[in-house]
Amino acid sequence: MPGLFITATGTAVGKTWLTRALARNLVRRHHTVAALKPIETGVVSEALDAVAIARASGQPEDAELPSLYRSAPALAPWSLTLRGDHDPLIMDPLVAMISTRGRESEWLLVEAAGGILVPLTERATNADLAAVLGLPLVMVAKDELGTLSHTLTAMESAQRRGLEVAAVVLMQSAPDAGAGSNHDVLSRMLAPTPVLAFRQTEDDDDALADEAERCGLMALLLGD
């Protein structure tokens, strides 16, 4: 079962956009895809990120599977537990649900909640969830001033845990002083891990799928 764990240097850097891009591109290639965001906080009426990636995969019901973790306060699960805002996250049923959907599909895409070391429980982080699932990472970072340290720190955390990183993807939106040079620096410092630049422009699943093609991500993942 091919799959990816889409994580990041932090929150609000473009993971959902990238997951939508991957899901729609794979669907256009006639693959069945389970695109899941098993943990999502900041949920008011519906889990917007989970809904968006499930729709992009053509499986909208994946946003409402049992054992998904949802919370209104936009905090890490362990923070919510400490505050008494949510029951502790139980990893085993979450992992079982993700694994089941993965076995039912040709591709499994799991979008993390926030960055690589977001605490899910007292002892487990997103990195631990990725390790249990056995999925290679796609590390998403925002192409802006300051991302060098953020990305190198996140990558060091992943590598120290023995996690495979398939690619680093720099999400480019508004012009920024660090944009452009970040790619050059990270490509050299993180070699042989590929570093790709994804233009985050049009909010449309098919346009995002096209960009995943243009930036070389699909060729990298599929060996095209």
Where are these regions (language model features)?
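Switch II (G3) loop of P-loop NTPases
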Residues: 94-121
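Short coil/turn connectors at secondary-structure junctions
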Residues: 1-2, 29-32, 60-61, 103-106, ...
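Conserved catalytic-core segment of NTP-binding enzymes
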Residues: 12, 22-23, 112-192, 196-197
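Short, charged/polar "capping" segments at the starts of alpha-helices
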Residues: 43-44, 175-180, 205-206
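C-terminal binding/interaction regions
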Residues: 182-223
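Beta-strand->loop->alpha-helix junctions that form or flank phosphate-binding loops
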Residues: 37-40, 64-69, 168-171, 187, ...
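N-terminal phosphate/diphosphate-binding loop that engages ATP/GTP or pyrophosphate donors
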Residues: 3, 17-88, 92, 97-100
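Hydrophobic anchor at the beta1->P-loop junction of P-loop NTPases
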Residues: 6-7
